[in-house]
């Protein structure tokens, strides 16, 4: 049986939620459900795109929101040490194989300035979904 984007997003969320939840100090959310005013170290998982073939293929987005650290004089800077930890964590996580899914890193993990309080670490995973239905 084929699955839609929201179902695939939820499957990926269910696959990684426990490990990511233990790793981050904030919460793990589906796309569009992270509290707007959160400045915690959160993770958001979202469906990007998919091809509906015998083996469904596509991409999912995993974003980590990393609070900036105080550099003194009211200046906040990117938390490089924590971003490196997240990158290493994700590299181990993407090797996960389930009965239904295979995951591959689509592109180099990168970070950019979300705002003056947090940095966004972006991971794009490619998936292949195998179904015997």
Predicted regions and their residues:
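A short, hydrophobic beta-strand-centered structural micro-motif
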Residues: 38-47
